[in-house]
Amino acid sequence: MSTYQRPNIQRMQGYSWGEQPKDGQAIKLNTNENPYPPSPHVAAALNDFATTELRTYPQPTADALRERIAHLHGLSRNQVVITHAGDEALRLAVTTYVSPGGTFASTNPSYSLYPVLAQIQDAQPFNVDLESNWTIPADFATQASAANAQLTCVVNPHAPSGHLTRAEQLHRIAEEISGVLLIDEAYADFIDPEIGYTSRELVEQHDNVLVLRTFSKGYSLAGLRLGYLLGNQSLITPIIDKTRDSYNIDAISQRLGIAALEDQTYAQSTWARVREQRQLLAQQLSELGWTCVASETNFLLSTPPNDSTAAA
């Protein structure tokens, strides 16, 4: 039977999403969703949304939402592009900055969508193994540059470990690589604020850094599919003007995104509760003999004791 697929599409395996239990009894943890509901401001904005607005196309570049996000991060609107969740942000970065036949580098293990996006682009995924303690190897940038990576991705905090790479190391990587560094901060809202981590200076000081954020985890809006990229205007403008889909963010998502950002008190209270429960769970697992990686996310990577039967 003949196929009309491009050869690289025919060869590749697609992305496998997490299992979606339907019995209504399973406690769903496999996609790291926020256990708390969205802000009441989001519910109110949805209730007040006039369906007559759906007759016309939404504001093409979601400027009001871009302004809110820029203010939140201490940046300008020209340094922000809104995307259809973090996954579209990744796709746009690959489409814009990785040539067919080029290389997309990341750490291993990492988000399983990365190699899929590379293969769709007919590019080569290139993996650099993390150290045994989940840290990024000192020669990571050297290896990525030797592979001629046009786009290099670091998940921070990392999934599946929860380990946080300090901004100082990310500055060094940005300086040493030859292409674009994309920092995937899908879980950054759960970082302990006392650590003082921020990627704003990375965006301000390097013209080759993109930072990915999403509303899915921290703002409990995984079902809405809303995210964004931060970066130097020279990186953001081609995405907005050339590779982004037309009207990629619908009117409802723009309105609800603004509502979520307006209620920082609620958002930060849920993040604090997640951190409290994370610490409590790690302590309880430790008392049972489990080993947990220090996490700055909303999940824990835990290893059972050798005698797991006894621990149970």
Residue ranges and their predicted role:
Residues 1-56, 148:
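N-terminal "arm"/small-domain region of PLP-dependent enzymes with the aminotransferase-like
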